[in-house]
């Protein structure tokens, strides 16, 4: 994939729409379960978006009735009685873990639209997004404990931070599911809406972000991520650095000019 091109694969459609990069899960017969090829394609797309000045926001949606049912375990393990010792530990960092890390660290804001089921890595993909709009009746679920397995793709890192450890235990340990409206009430997702309106609301939010000051939004995203693991003194230094960097942007100058002229700013993402 070149710096300014975006490829699609079976199960994932990626396309650039102005300043918005669209990624649509397109495997409805499998509840949009991810496979290795889809994960690699999405990672490549986010990598390219990080280098492409045209991209100012990413929108992740899904075709069909469900957002993502998790990984396609059956296809992945076809013909194998059990994983070889060490195979999971070797493969996850290059697949599921890389994807969630990329969603968290890409410099432009990411919005996801969830209808139906979001389970396992599907839930983590939505939760790692900067904003998630979920259907009121969406089903957000961690299936691992009911399968005798442990969570992957940063679920045990994301959920306690977003919803608190007590609520996270209900999902991760007991396997309790949440509706979209319940998830919005406790802060696991940004907002909940009627299923028919989810995609439109998520796109409106993504376009709002795509029209924003891209440099400062990216730096704010970085500050919020690293602030979870840094000391206060280090974080204050990071804030000072981010302010210095954002003050050099064209959008900062436009923001000041618009303020003095008493008009709305017209940001260009630079």
Residue ranges of model-derived segments:
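Hydrophobic/basic alpha-helical segments enriched in Actinobacteria
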Residues: 13-14, 22, 65, 71, ...
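Short, charged, surface-exposed hinge/linker loops at domain edges
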Residues: 221-230
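Crotonase-fold acyl-CoA enzyme core
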Residues: 101-217, 240, 244-249, 253-256, ...
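Glycine- (often His-adjacent) and acidic-residue-rich active-site loop
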Residues: 62-99, 118, 146-148, 231
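Terminal peptide-recognition signature
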Residues: 23, 27, 42, 60, ...
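Conserved CoA-thioester-binding segment of acyl-CoA-metabolizing enzymes
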Residues: 1-63, 101
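Terminal low-complexity tails and localization/encapsulation signals of metabolic enzymes
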Residues: 1-9, 257-270
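Hydrophobic alpha-helical membrane-association signature
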Residues: 38-42, 92-95, 198, 239
